C-alpha cells in the first residue's frame, strides 16, 4: 500500500482509545511524564489526528486525538477539526440516531453518542458551543426511547455489526450522563447496564480457561440460549 495517499490506518482508531485512557488515568500516567516524553507522544498522536480517515464514525477518532492535544496545550488544525465535526452533524438522521455510512446500528450508540459527549467535554463546549449543543440535543433525544432497545432484564437486543462488543450498546447512557444537560435516568441507566453485563458474564460459555470468548454468544443459540440461561439462574 506504499504510496497510497488516500489510505486510512487502523491505528487512528487505537490512538483514540489511547487518549481516552490517558485522560481517565491522567494523574497516574500522563502527569508523570516529562515535557520531552509528552512531546514525543503528542507528535505520534498528531500523525493520526491530522491524517486520513474514513468518512463515517472514524472522524470522531481524529476529533478526539486533536481535542486531547488541544487540551494539553498543543496546537491543532482547527479547520480540520471543524470539518470533521460538521461532517458528523451531517450524518444525523433524527431521533438521536446517526447514519454510519449508509447503515443504522449500535455504532450510532457506542461511537457517535459516546465520543461526541467526550469531545464536548474536551473541546466542544468551549471552542465550538453550537456543535456541542447539537451533539447534546441529539443524545438527549436518543434517551427518550433508547431504553426500549433492552428487555425487562436489561438484556441487549443483538443487532447490526460487531455483536462481539456485547454490552457496549449500553455505553450511550454513559455518554449522555457526561453531558452538561443530561436527561438520562441514572437509575434506569444503571439497571440496564448491569443487566446487559450480567447477560454475558453469567453464561457458562463466557469464559474459556478464564479468558472471555469471542462473539456475542459463542454458541449463537439466539432466543433458546437466553431461555436456557434463565433456567440456570432459577
What does each model-identified segment do?
Residues 177-234:
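Extended polysaccharide-engagement surfaces of secreted carbohydrate-active enzymes
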Residues 1-177:
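Aromatic-lined, polymer-binding surfaces characteristic
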Amino acid at each position: 500500500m506504499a504510496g497510497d495517499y488516500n489510505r486510512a490506518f487502523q491505528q487512528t482508531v487505537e490512538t483514540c482509545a489511547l487518549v481516552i485512557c490517558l485522560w481517565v488515568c491522567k494523574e497516574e500516567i500522563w502527569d508523570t511524564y516529562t515535557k520531552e516524553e509528552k512531546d514525543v507522544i503528542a507528535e505520534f498522536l498528531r500523525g493520526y489526528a491530522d491524517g486520513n480517515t474514513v468518512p463515517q464514525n472514524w472522524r470522531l477518532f481524529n476529533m478526539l486525538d486533536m481535542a486531547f492535544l488541544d487540551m494539553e496545550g498543543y496546537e491543532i488544525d482547527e479547520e480540520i477539526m471543524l470539518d470533521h465535526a460538521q461532517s458528523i452533524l451531517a450524518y444525523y438522521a433524527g431521533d438521536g440516531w446517526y447514519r454510519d455510512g449508509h447503515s443504522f446500528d449500535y455504532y450510532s450508540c457506542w461511537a457517535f453518542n459516546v465520543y461526541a459527549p467526550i469531545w464536548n467535554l474536551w473541546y466542544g463546549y468551549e471552542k465550538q458551543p453550537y456543535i456541542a449543543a447539537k451533539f447534546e440535543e441529539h443524545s438527549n433525544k436518543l434517551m427518550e426511547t433508547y431504553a426500549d432497545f433492552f428487555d425487562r432484564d436489561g438484556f441487549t437486543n443483538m443487532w447490526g455489526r460487531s455483536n462481539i462488543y456485547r454490552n457496549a450498546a449500553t455505553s450511550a447512557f454513559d455518554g449522555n450522563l457526561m453531558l452538561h444537560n443530561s436527561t438520562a435516568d441514572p437509575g434506569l441507566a444503571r439497571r440496564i447496564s448491569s443487566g446487559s453485563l450480567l447477560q454475558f458474564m453469567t453464561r457458562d460459555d463466557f469464559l474459556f480457561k478464564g479468558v472471555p470468548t469471542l462473539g456475542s454468544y459463542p454458541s449463537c443459540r439466539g432466543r433458546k440460549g437466553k431461555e436456557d440461561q434463565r433456567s440456570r439462574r432459577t
